C-alpha cells in the first residue's frame, strides 16, 4: 500500500487496528462469561479489510 493515503482511509485503517484486539478480562468477569471473545478479531493474512 502506498505511503500517501487519503485521510479517510487512514482513519478507517486505524479504527480496524484498534478493533483487532482481544476483550479485557474484566469484561469477561463483569458479564459473568456471557461475552468471552471479540467477534471482530481478524488475522492480517487470512481476512481482507473492506476499506
Curated annotation (Swiss-Prot):
Keywords: Ribonucleoprotein, Ribosomal protein. It comes from the Archaea. GO terms for molecular function: structural constituent of ribosome. Pfam families: Ribosomal_L39. Disulfide bonds: none annotated. GO terms for cellular component: cytosolic large ribosomal subunit. InterPro entries: Ribosomal_eL39, Ribosomal_eL39_CS, Ribosomal_eL39_dom_sf. One of its GO terms (biological process) is translation. HAMAP family: Ribosomal_eL39. Belongs to the eukaryotic ribosomal protein eL39 family. This is Large ribosomal subunit protein eL39.
